[in-house]
């Protein structure tokens, strides 16, 4: 016989509104994690603040450590700046409702996702306490540098012997309709910064100068037109895009001494940050030799590509999505990076959340009925996971 609920269910829509009203523009905590800690503690979760480097993080676990299997949720409460507040039709931290829409910064990315999994987890442990543990790892550093957020939580977990066996990151994953996409991996991201150095001089005396501009144009052409691969079963082809070329030369009769170029690569599991850095260095050296310039290069790796192969976890989430939304989510690795790139070093991870095409925009908003659907999806995932 199923257990009769003894508590009123947590309203994920009201919780989303409460979180939106917290001004938590990264790296500010803004009261969002304080609010969640109070709510989760009241529901019997053991909460620990894992702050590092001025960043606030919250680790909440229900269940005895080491007792049975552990299901994890990961998300963030920090948000990007609002931009031109005068352009908003609703206050960005007002959580105002207009029809089936709630407006506010973080409405989509991703205070609604955090509210949905927190509400689902609380209701689940109150109504059907599992033989195991549920962990919520929530950071205030995803939209910023991401160095003291989920990484800090995972480092702390390793130090104290905490673990999760599988994890859902609640980022907005659906491009058009609630339930239409789940992320089972992400492309890697690498940025390269080039400084091309020539010899400054008068543009009328080209024999006395070394112009860095043709060199940077040649390098940019070689990098951006090179076919890195044709893609794989689960990944699109890797790409290399020029994002900036800067000279800072206001004079029309002076050959500049140097120019800078930045390129951004998004790569699949046929490559690594090291292999692509080696390729970039080789191309830069070739252009430098051909043009008589000196080319300096530095790189920043935001994350390696990763894949959680289709299997038990994606099947579990996919069936829950199908049951609650009527849609079978496409398994995808598209989009930018997320904190799943850190979680994947700890346990199998997939991402599933709301429709994301309004995130980071003026008048960011979320469909209220989608928040309710997402809570039900997460609740069904927990039910099926602990029943297995």
Curated annotation (Swiss-Prot):
- Keywords attached to this entry: Amino-acid biosynthesis, Cobalt, Diaminopimelate biosynthesis, Hydrolase, Lysine biosynthesis, Metal-binding, Zinc
One GO BP annotation is: lysine biosynthetic process via diaminopimelate
**What Gene Ontology molecular-function terms does this entry list?**
acetylornithine deacetylase activity; cobalt ion binding; succinyl-diaminopimelate desuccinylase activity; zinc ion binding
EC number(s)?
3.5.1.18
Which pathway does the database say it acts in? Amino-acid biosynthesis; L-lysine biosynthesis via DAP pathway; LL-2,6-diaminopimelate from (S)-tetrahydrodipicolinate (succinylase route): step 3/3
For the ligand (Zn(2+) 1), the binding residues are 76, 109, 171
Reaction(s) catalysed (UniProt annotation): N-succinyl-(2S,6S)-2,6-diaminopimelate + H2O = (2S,6S)-2,6-diaminopimelate + succinate
Please describe what this protein does.
Answer: Catalyzes the hydrolysis of N-succinyl-L,L-diaminopimelic acid (SDAP), forming succinate and LL-2,6-diaminopimelate (DAP), an intermediate involved in the bacterial biosynthesis of lysine and meso-diaminopimelic acid, an essential component of bacterial cell walls.
The protein's matches in InterPro entries, at most eight in alphabetical order, are given as:
ArgE/DapE_CS (IPR001261), Bact_exopeptidase_dim_dom (IPR036264), DapE_proteobac (IPR005941), Peptidase_M20 (IPR002933), Peptidase_M20_dimer (IPR011650), Peptidase_M20A (IPR050072)
Gene source species? Jannaschia sp. (strain CCS1)
Q: Quaternary structure per UniProt?
A: Homodimer.
What cofactor requirement does the entry state?
Zn(2+); Co(2+)
Sites binding Zn(2+) 2 sit at: 109, 143, 360
> Is Isomerase a UniProt keyword of this protein?
no
Taxon lineage: Bacteria, Pseudomonadati, Pseudomonadota, Alphaproteobacteria, Rhodobacterales
User: Which named protein is this?
Assistant: Succinyl-diaminopimelate desuccinylase
Against Gene3D superfamilies, the record matches this protein to: Zn peptidases
Question: Does the keyword field hold Transport?
Answer: no
- Similarity comment text for this entry: Belongs to the peptidase M20A family. DapE subfamily.
What does the UniProt cofactor note say? Binds 2 Zn(2+) or Co(2+) ions per subunit.
Which gene underlies this protein? dapE
- Tell me which residues this entry annotates as catalytic: 78, 142
């Amino acid at each position: 016989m199923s257990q009769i609920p003894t508590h009123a269910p947590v309203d994920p829509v009201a919780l989303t509104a409460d979180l939106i009203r917290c001004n938590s523009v990264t790296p500010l905590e803004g009261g969002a994690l304080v609010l969640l800690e109070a709510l989760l503690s009241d529901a019997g979760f053991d909460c620990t603040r894992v702050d590092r480097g001025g960043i606030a993080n919250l680790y909440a676990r229900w269940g005895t450590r080491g007792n049975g299997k552990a299901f994890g949720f990961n998300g963030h409460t920090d948000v990007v700046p609002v931009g031109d507040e005068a352009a908003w039709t609703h206050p960005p931290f007002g959580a105002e409702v207009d029809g089936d829409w709630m407006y506010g910064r973080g409405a989509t990315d991703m205070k609604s996702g955090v509210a949905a999994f927190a509400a689902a987890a609380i209701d689940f442990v109150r109504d059907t306490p599992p033989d195991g543990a549920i962990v919520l790892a929530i950071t205030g550093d995803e939209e910023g540098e991401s160095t003291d957020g989920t990484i800090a939580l995972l480092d702390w977990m390793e130090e104290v012997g905490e673990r999760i066996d599988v994890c859902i990151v609640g980022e907005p994953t659906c491009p058009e309709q609630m339930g239409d996409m789940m992320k089972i991996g992400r492309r890697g991201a690498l940025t390269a910064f080039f400084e091309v150095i020539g010899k400054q001089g008068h543009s009328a005396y080209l024999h006395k100068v070394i112009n860095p501009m043709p060199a940077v144009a040649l390098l940019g052409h070689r990098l951006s037109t090179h076919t890195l691969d044709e893609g794989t079963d689960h990944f699109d082809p890797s790409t290399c895009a020029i994002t900036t070329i800067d000279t800072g030369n206001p004079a029309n009769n002076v050959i500049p001494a140097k120019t800078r170029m930045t390129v951004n690569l998004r790569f699949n599991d046929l490559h690594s940050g090291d292999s692509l850095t080696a390729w970039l260095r080789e191309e830069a050296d070739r252009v430098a030799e051909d043009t008589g310039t000196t080319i300096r290069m530095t790189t920043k790796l935001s994350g390696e590509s990763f894949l959680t192969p289709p299997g038990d976890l994606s099947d579990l989430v996919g069936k829950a999505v199908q049951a609650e939304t009527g849609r079978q989510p496409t398994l995808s690795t598209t989009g930018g990076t997320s904190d799943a790139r850190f979680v994947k070093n700890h346990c199998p991870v997939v991402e599933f959340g709301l429709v994301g095409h309004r995130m980071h925009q003026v008048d960011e908003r979320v469909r209220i009925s989608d928040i309710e659907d997402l809570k039900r999806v997460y609740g069904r995932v927990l039910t099926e996971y602990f029943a297995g």
